[in-house]
Amino acid sequence: MAGVLSKLHNSAQHVKDLAAAYLRDGEKGRQSDIERKSNQFANVQLRIVVMGESGSGKSTLINALRGLDEDEEGAAPTDCTATTTEITPYPHPTLPNVHYYDFPGLNTVKFPVKTFMKKTNFAQYDLGIIVTGSRFTENDQLLAKALEKAGKPIYLVRSKIDETVRSERRRKGYNQEETLQRVREQCISSLKAAGIQEPRVFLCSAFDLDQYDFPKLKETVVSNLSETL
Ligand SMILES: Nc1nc2c(ncn2[C@@H]2O[C@H](COP(=O)(O)OP(=O)(O)OP(=O)(O)O)[C@@H](O)[C@H]2O)c(=O)[nH]1
Ligand SMILES: [Mg+2]
C-alpha cells in the first residue's frame, strides 16, 4: 500500500492502538500512546502536487488554498505570461507537514511535454491536483494517467469557471446550473476516458472563492489529509 492509502491505513491502526492501550492500561496508557504516535506523525510529510498546462491557474489556486492574496508576501508569483519556472514547495497554512508543490506549466518551450513527463517522478507525491482551463487537453490526460499509474489520488480542478459563466451568460435561455453541470460532466467523462475510476472534479474560480466548488475543494483537501496525520 503506497502514499495516502498507507497513511490512511496507519491512521485507522492508530485508533485501534489507542483503544487497545486504553483497555490495557486505562487513561495513562492512552496518553503515552498519543505521545508516541504524535512523535511518529510529526515526521510524516505529505506532498500535494499541482500540475497542468501553462497559465491554467496553478499558482493562483495554491495561493487561494493557502488563504493568500497574490501580492501578499510568500505568495506564489502569478501572471498572464508564463511565470513558474521551478518546482516550488509552499507550506499548507495550518498543517506544517503538508506542502503544495507548484509546478511549471506543461507544454511551454522551456518545459515541453516529453521532457516534463520523463523528468517528473510522480511516485514521490501523495496527491495530485490537475488544474485545467477551458478544455481538458491531451496533456491533462497524460498527467492523469501518470498519476493514476503511480497510484495517487487525483483531484481535477476546472479553473476560471467565472470566465465560462460570464461568456455563456450571453446566450439565449442561459441557465447557470445546467451550464455548470455540462462542464462537470465533460470533466468527469474526460477523466473516465483517461482510466480514472472515480473522478473527483471541482469547478473553481480564484476570484469568487466562496462560490462554485472552491469551499468544497478546500475542505476535502484538509479532511482527507488531516485523517492521515
Ligand atoms: N478569471 C480567472 N482568472 C484566473 C483564475 N485563476 C487564475 N487566473 C488568471 O490566469 C492567469 C495565470 O494564472 P497563474 O496562476 O499564474 O497560472 P499558472 O498555471 O501558475 O501559470 P504558469 O506558472 O505560467 O504555468 C493569471 O492572469 C491569473 O490571474 C480564475 O479562477 N479566474
Ligand atoms: Mg505558476
Explain the meaning of each model-derived region:
Residues 144-158:
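P-loop/Walker A phosphate-binding loop and immediately adjacent motor/lid segment at beta-alpha junctions
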Residues 82-88, 99-148:
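Switch II of P-loop NTPase G domains
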Residues 105-108, 135-137, 160-164, 207-210:
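Conserved nucleotide-binding/hydrolysis micro-motifs of P-loop NTPases
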Residues 162-229:
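Canonical P-loop GTPase G-domain recognition
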Residues 128-133, 157-159, 203-204:
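Conserved beta-strand segments of the P-loop GTPase G domain that flank and frequently precede/overlap
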Residues 2-103:
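Conserved G1/Walker A P-loop phosphate-binding module
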Residues 78, 98-112, 156, 164-167, ...:
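AAA+ P-loop NTPase catalytic core and its hallmark functional loops
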Residues 123-127, 150-154, 196-200:
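Short glycine-/polar-rich loops that comprise or flank the Walker A/P-loop
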